[in-house]
């Protein structure tokens, strides 16, 4: 099973609106593992790993905003060369 991993930073109305927990639900449904955390600059930082098709679906949902209260104004991603060995998808901060 081939896995890809990405590091993602989203900005906009992404804190205090349930963004992390909605993203976790999406990740759990798509069998994506990784972490998500709020950053002090108001952004949200995500590391996500999974099968390519599921990871693409996850990214599309994150870009669109995982719930109706969130609004993603900027989205940045970088591939991770080494796929971390995450256990599930965790809200870490």
UniProtKB/Swiss-Prot annotation:
<dbReference type="InterPro" id="IPR036046">
    <property type="entry name" value="Acylphosphatase-like_dom_sf"/>
</dbReference>
<feature type="active site">
    <location>
        <position position="38"/>
    </location>
</feature>
<dbReference type="InterPro" id="IPR020456">
    <property type="entry name" value="Acylphosphatase"/>
</dbReference>
<dbReference type="Pfam" id="PF00708">
    <property type="entry name" value="Acylphosphatase"/>
</dbReference>
<dbReference type="GO" id="GO:0003998">
    <property type="term" value="F:acylphosphatase activity"/>
</dbReference>
<feature type="active site">
    <location>
        <position position="20"/>
    </location>
</feature>
<dbReference type="InterPro" id="IPR017968">
    <property type="entry name" value="Acylphosphatase_CS"/>
</dbReference>
<protein>
    <recommendedName>
        <fullName>Acylphosphatase</fullName>
        <ecNumber>3.6.1.7</ecNumber>
    </recommendedName>
</protein>
<keyword id="KW-0378">Hydrolase</keyword>
<comment type="similarity">
    <text>Belongs to the acylphosphatase family.</text>
</comment>
<feature type="domain" description="Acylphosphatase-like">
    <location>
        <begin position="5"/>
        <end position="93"/>
    </location>
</feature>
<dbReference type="InterPro" id="IPR001792">
    <property type="entry name" value="Acylphosphatase-like_dom"/>
</dbReference>
